[in-house]
Design a protein with these regions (language model features):
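Short, hydrophobic/amphipathic alpha-helical patches that form generic packing surfaces
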Residues: 25, 32-33, 62-74, 304-321, ...
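Extended, helix-rich architectural segments
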Residues: 1-214, 221
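Globular "head" domains of long coiled-coil molecular machines
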Residues: 198-234, 240-252
Length: 569
């Protein structure tokens, strides 16, 4: 079996890093303005230091907050179902037994997502996605069976794509102190002592000397297992994905060496050891991005609005300077006034000598500053509206910003606008984020959830597929419902004139369409077999009633004749 090599890992890290260096400068600029609190790693800043002191106009901060809240609630809401699971055979899904199990499976998947920290991690992801057009999760199953989702810090990870533009390898860099490293990755012998077989000699010495605070640079790489054999999937260590964690550098550490790059030397090249070697059958990371061609997204609201953001910031500073010049201008006057106690405070006495009074000396502004504040404010407001549009805040907050115009027609118009404007972003999120996240949890529930009921025998060998029912997804799929409603209304109106038009109208199809477009829960519409059985029973009952009504007059006449005959006798 092929052994893993640090040299190979380092070669791949340098390859991935060289690709990231193409956009590093852009990310630094985007993070500095869009997410300054997340620029610590990529800009090598000190932890705890305030990083947004250069931001004066917060328009984009508020717009980004609306963007994150809108996508968190509209795409992956914690308060309502945003996905359901079916099979690729839609006819098989219509079976009552299959539909009930698929609903049960969906509930278990949503429960697994809800009991993890996914929704908190998703909020951080949308911040990264809105600023650098890329976000990444790493999934970790804790020893107690719980799922913890890590949102990776922008700039601390590198990505390599496969031939289809999907992330095939991710390489993380992070710093950890000596004590935390030994506690997390250190092993124990059978007698409870320390097993130092996977810890470098330098780190061991630091730990034994009590030098716990020294930061160690660590690399964690995740890629497809080169030793994976698909012909033997049940083998314990034969799993598709490989995780390798190893020490990279020791000494000051990343956060402790301000302005320096991540250390680039292995602690001890002679010690070809890994802190952790781990294989898993599930791809443990997701890289969501706005475009598929490059390893990282290249299109997004912040990069489109960056010029406006900087201009607004500059205008805010210039406006404050202009107002300051009006209130406290630079003054000129006789030199004799320098001896006076000049003050801008109200109700203040400024003593003057007799010569200054006779010469009618006075102070005058050096510059004639008369800024068009009204024009500047209007220009700033126009730019703020453009920033809101680039972050979709004007659509996401339409109802809250227009509380007096919440008519059904306008609400429907907003949904159609969301479909057209947010649609491209949603498609990208589906391919690079929603589907991978949901498929990871689906696989986790299938193999790890003890409360999942066994599927019906009729579903054996069927491939499962996720379907999204979020607010944004409904806005896209339900776009034809207004036209269907108009058609149904037309049929109802025409039926009052000529009821024969109802023969053309398929009510069952209408019910099925609404169930599909609105993603209604399973079981709300009866299966077609039950509907047909009920209609057959109703038709049989109607037929018996009709037969009874037809035979009743003859029976009554016979009874009357018999009664008359008895009376004659």
């Amino acid at each position: 079996m092929k052994r893993y090599s640090k040299q190979t890992c380092e070669f791949q890290r340098q390859q991935a890093k060289s690709k990231f260096d193409k956009i590093r400068k852009t990310w630094c600029d985007l993070l500095r303005w869009g997410l300054p609190h997340k620029s610590t790693w990529i800009l090598s800043q000190t932890e705890g230091e305030r990083k947004n002191q250069h931001i004066v106009d917060p328009t984009h901060v508020l717009a980004l907050r609306s963007f994150v809240a809108g996508f968190l609630e509209g795409n992956t809401s914690a308060s309502r179902p945003w996905a359901r699971i079916g099979t690729k055979d839609s006819e098989r899904d219509d079976s009552s037994e299959n539909k009930q199990w698929l609903q049960h499976f969906t509930d278990r998947v949503m429960n697994a997502i809800g009991t993890s920290n996914f929704y908190h991690a998703a909020g951080n992801f949308y911040y990264d996605y809105g600023v650098v057009n890329t976000g990444s999760h790493y999934f970790e199953v804790l020893p107690n069976g719980a799922v913890h989702v890590h949102t990776l810090i922008p700039g601390s990870y590198y990505v390599l794509n496969d031939a289809y533009g999907e992330a095939a390898q991710i390489i993380r860099e992070f710093s950890i102190n000596v004590k935390a490293l030994v506690d997390k990755y250190g092993q124990r012998t059978k007698d409870g002592g320390r097993d130092w077989s996977n810890i470098s000699s330098s780190v061991r010495k630091m730990y034994e000397d009590g030098n716990y605070g020294t930061m160690i640079d660590v690399v964690h790489t995740v890629k497809e297992n080169p030793n994976y054999d698909f012909r033997d999937p049940d083998a314990f260590e034969n799993k598709q994905w490989l995780e390798l964690t190893y020490e990279l550098g020791a000494g000051s550490g990343h956060f402790w060496a301000e302005g320096q790059e991540f250390a680039g030397t292995i602690v001890d090249k002679k010690e070809e050891i890994f802190l952790k070697e781990f294989t898993t059958k599930r791809k443990p990371f997701v890289v969501g991005k706005s475009t598929n061609e490059f390893e990282y997204g290249e299109k997004g609201p912040t990069i489109d609005a960056l010029g406006l953001i900087k201009s607004l910031n500059k205008k805010a500073i210039s406006k404050d300077q202009a107002i300051e010049q009006i209130l406290k201008p630079a003054l000129q006057g006789p030199a004799s006034l320098r001896k006076s106690y000049i003050s801008h405070a109200p109700n203040t006495f400024v003593p003057l000598d007799a010569k200054s009074i006779q010469g009618k000396s006075k102070l005058e502004p050096i510059f004639s500053v008369n800024p068009a504040i009204g024009t500047l404010i209007q220009d700033v407001e126009d730019m703020r509206q453009q920033v809101d549009k680039l972050y979709y805040a004007d659509f996401l907050l339409f109802l809250s910003r227009n509380p007096k115009t919440r008519t059904a027609t306008e609400t429907s118009a907003v949904l159609e606008e969301q479909q057209r404007i947010i649609g491209p972003n949603l498609q990208s999120l589906n391919n690079t984020y929603n589907i991978p996240v949901l498929e990871w949890f689906m696989d986790f529930v299938l193999f790890e959830d003890p409360y999942l009921k066994p599927p019906p025998s009729s579903m054996e060998g069927q491939a499962l597929k996720p379907e999204f029912i979020s607010v944004f997804a409904q806005a896209q799929k339900a776009a034809d419902l207004p036209a269907i409603d108009r058609y149904a209304g037309m049929i109802a109106n025409v039926a009052q004139i000529d009821p024969r038009v109802l023969d053309k109208f398929n009510v069952d199809k209408l019910a099925d369409l609404y169930e599909d477009r609105l993603y209604l829960p399973a079981g709300l519409n009866n299966p077609q077999s039950i509907v047909d059985a009920k209609r057959e029973q109703a038709a049989a009952a109607q037929q018996r009633k009709q037969q009874l009504e037809e035979t009743l007059p003859a029976v009554a006449k016979s009874a009357k004749d018999m009664a008359a005959a008895k009376m004659q006798q």
